[in-house]
Amino acid sequence: MKTNTFRPLVLSAAGLLAVSTAFGNAFTAPDGPVRKEVKEVRPLKAVLKDAKAIDAILQKAYAKHEVTPLPAADDATLVRRAYLAIAGRIPSYEETLAYLENDDSAKLSALVDHLLDSPAHDSATFNWWADLLRLQTRQRGGNQVGAGEAYVHWVKDAVRQNLPFDEVARRLITAEGYPWEDGAVGYYLRDAGMPLDNMSNTTQVFLGTQMVCAQCHNHPFDKWTQMEYYKMAAYTYGVRDRVNNPKQRELQQAFYAKTRGLSREERAKLTRSREFQQLRRATGEMMRPLQYGADRTERKLQLPHDYQYEDAKPKDVIAAAPIFGQAIAPAEGEDAVDAYAQWMTASDNPRFTKVIANRMWKRVFGVGVFEPVDDLRDDTVPSNPELLEHLEALMVRLDYDLKQFARVLYNVKAFSREASAEEITVDKPYHFPGPALARMSAEQLWDSFVTLALPYPDERLLDRARLDYRMEQLAVYEEKMEKLDAKKLTGLAKKGAKASKAIAAKMERIQKQMAEAAENDDREAMARLRREYGQVRNEQRTSFAKLVMGDDFDVRSLYGYGRGNGASAKRDPRWAGFSSQLMRASELPTPAPPGHFLREFGQSDREVIENASREASVPQALTLLNGVIYREVYRQNSPLSENVVRAQTPKDKVRVLFLSILNREPTAEESETCLVELKEALAQVAPQPKVPEHLKGEKRKKYLRYLEKKRQTQQTYGPVAKAYQGIAWALLNTRQFSFVQ
């Protein structure tokens, strides 16, 4: 990936941001095509025309419902709102100044284009997808082969490449093979062992239709029957989350051959023998990495044993049928899954386009044209039917390009108005006099702290070298296994069974020693034995793969060890000394572990679709009062600290704090209050001595540098620094900081 040099944002005379140098003229996504800038794909003139059409529809609604649109927001509010909405974080001090100091009337449109083209937008959009698809770095299905990580990176690549929404949906639904062949198979592995739930998750995400209740009985609050649920689920029920590898069948036949000609008693005795069981376990271990993926089979779906309705009998085999519209007829060369994906994402599907258009509207304005966005019913009444119909048509016309669609919405006048503090309720339509006032999401809040604490936060990306290496090695392992016949594989398994027996004895011995150490409360011995046990267990895991691949093969890579260290930060001098965990939320494991800042502030646990929360809580207040994140924000080389130190006067420093944290100028009263707070600390600083007149030339320059260094030291450490940190702490604990206005 290209590393780009940061430059402050500047505006041309024409009013367009000259930002191509900030992130390169194009961005190349991993394994993807060169991505064009948004203005290359579609001219701004066309975008503004579409935005004006939406303005007109909203204006009609204002008149009809006697709604007064809110006043235009000021520049400081707009730059902060745009960054939080599009980039997922507050603007930096430099980015804030660049916008506020520019007088061009087209600067908001230009900023929108710049942000949509930036890696910051990719980060924020990934978080949106992660909530929608319940992404988990360590998901249950296929975790043994890194399927969760592969799925996460597949979604990141789709975002970077700006794949159209309908294309993303089709690729997820039709994914098949191993994670190293197609990371999108994580869509099925995410719901491993739960194919019926996978279908109801699909309809909720892509059709805004909640069918989960109909899995066990007819839906009590909607029209869906249990029969309709099962007919819909039949399309993808044949997709198994365990791959039926031909090699596995060969091995089964080889084992069956050993029992051929034996009596029932002899066969039972053989298959129960320890040697036979060890051999089967050994071959199972060799095949284990090749078990996880999405495999299309002829498996048929049956009704449950307790089906209670008169239209069929329990355990009847069910034929696939859509929940609405005409029957799906697969085209030539298509199977039922392909046809199902085409039906799901068709532009004339009555719900697919409507739902994504509404989701995107909510992402920009905080409230959907209909709510909830994922519980669309026949009796759902949108707050503005004309607007919803227009948004659907626009989405189709833009070929489901979410970036271009959002680009139109961010240029709608309502986005530039003051935020509405009106309480949003389901029984009262919201007519969008301005965006809804909202608390920051967990990811926005974390990423905003990271912006204050870390230079170039958008460029500190998780290093995918380790994952790529693991996927490459798994592909090599698969290829080698395919070349082994059953006889050779069984021979290797016999060797593996013997080795495994010896390793198992070693593990048993260590377990006994651990029990003795625990009884004697010998903590040092316990720690040592745990390490030993882990090493032996890893030896057991890798011994079978080593038999297949040979001693030269890096077998540890199959289990996520080996080349690559996870964070490019460890190799980049720009982040030397910064915590390896100080990265944007999109680059951390998803979801974050319990107790992490992100989880405390409502990040989804990724168990349920869009399960994040923005509700305030006592633990959040305590985290903002005393959180360890402040250590990073206040450290000497954080962007916030460096900008404060560079400012010359106390008044300038207060201004830097406000522009960095709240992204606005302090009022005269705020500035005066802060200076009063600083007075005592400033009184302890000795005045700078005058430069002796006899010092000339280089000596004079050297002495001035010494004075400047001394000044910076005084303001970086001691009571003065603590005083400025106190002001920063106060600003970070205001509602102005934690809300998107």
Q: Which functions belong to the PLM regions below?
A:
Residues S12-T21:
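Bacterial N-terminal signal peptides
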